[in-house]
């Protein structure tokens, strides 16, 4: 959030931040350096080799980037809303190790708060 600045002090190299939150290769436009990027128009989800013609999380803001962890642990960062959302707990759907329907449902509810 805030391109790596906290209280006016740069705590994360801004060049690294820019690279981490920018598409890192042409195979999967929705992937940076260990961060998943929304708003790219296509994505290849974890564990599949298929490119889907949709945003990574369609109901989330286009500028969102996120970290996905084991058992559905998530960190969503949305610079336009100055928001960080962390999801911890048991997997929302045990059939998928990372991305589940939970993500879109969560963003439908969060978006309703901003309307």
Description of each model-found segment:
Residues 2, 38-40, 89:
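Histidine- and/or cysteine-centered catalytic micro-motif in compact active-site loops
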Residues 67-115:
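Structured C-terminal helix/loop/strand segments within mature extracytoplasmic catalytic/sensor domains
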Residues 6, 35-36, 107:
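Tryptophan-centered motif/residue detector
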Residues 1-12:
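Bacterial peptidoglycan biogenesis and beta-lactam-recognition machinery
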Residues 13-22, 29:
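...with weaker cross-activation on analogous glycine-rich loops/strands in unrelated enzymes
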Residues 23-84:
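Active-site Gly/Thr loop motif
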Residues 12, 27, 102:
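Short acidic-hydrophobic sequence patches enriched in Asp/Glu that either
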Residues 2-4, 23, 109, 113:
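Structured segments of extracytoplasmic/periplasmic soluble domains
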């Amino acid at each position: 959030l805030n391109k790596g600045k906290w209280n006016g002090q740069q705590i994360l190299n801004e060049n690294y931040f820019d690279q981490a939150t920018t598409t890192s290769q042409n195979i999967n436009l929705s992937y940076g350096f260990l961060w998943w990027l929304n708003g790219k128009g296509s994505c290849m989800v974890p564990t599949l080799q298929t490119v889907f013609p949709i945003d990574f999380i369609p109901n989330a803001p286009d500028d969102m980037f996120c970290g996905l962890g084991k058992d559905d642990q998530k960190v969503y960062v949305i610079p336009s809303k100055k928001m960080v959302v962390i999801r911890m707990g048991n997997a929302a759907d045990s059939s998928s190790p990372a991305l589940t329907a939970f993500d879109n449902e969560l963003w439908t509810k969060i978006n309703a708060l901003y309307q």
